[in-house]
A protein has these predicted regions:
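Surface/interface recognition patches
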Residues: 1-167
Length: 167
């Protein structure tokens, strides 16, 4: 275990990815909080643009969208934005950190590779490089694990299921 200094820069990042790889990264500025409107402006609008560039024929049409049930994510304006742009929202049961790929895989993956940083800019740069260099197979493997977890969640009627997963 690496002991990190309390004086190292800390950062909040929103990462959007598909089974084929990274789609969009948004680093929150110091002091910035996520509310529904800046979630749309800083995350969902650029995400939608990126997907439309990656998939010029179909864009976001019929694309499944999963995020946890944090307050900004479940706001009516966010749901409306996603629906009007062709996304199908996959509901997230309350209190299920075992279901979100960011929680069960991505953030640990990033932390294991991070080196020490003395400033925010170098930390953002390294996080971006780590994310951009994750092999496509890793995203696919995580997507398959996510599907398994979704099935376990359904079987357990939305209750906690981490203890049922074969590590």
């Amino acid at each position: 275990m690496v002991r990190r200094s309390q004086f190292e820069p800390k950062i909040m990042v929103s990462v959007f990815f598909r089974s084929t790889g990274l789609v969009h990264i948004h680093f929150l500025k110091n002091g910035e909080t996520i509310n529904a409107h800046n979630y749309i402006r800083n995350c969902l609008e650029p995400l939608t643009s990126s997907i439309n560039e990656q998939r010029p024929t179909s864009g976001t049409k019929n694309m499944k969208f999963h995020h946890d049930n944090a307050k900004p994510h479940v706001a009516e304006c966010v749901k409306s934005y996603l629906n009007s742009n062709g996304f199908t929202i996959i509901r997230h049961p309350p209190y299920s950190p075992d279901l979100a790929p960011s929680d069960f895989w991505l953030f640990d993956y990033i932390k294991r590779q991070l080196t020490d940083h003395t400033n925010r800019k170098s930390l953002e740069k390294e996080i971006t490089e780590i994310l951009e260099n994750i092999p496509k197979e890793e995203y696919q493997k995580t997507f398959n694990k996510w599907l398994e977890r979704m099935e376990l969640c359904i079987q357990n009627q939305g209750h906690y299921f981490e203890h049922l997963i074969n590590k």
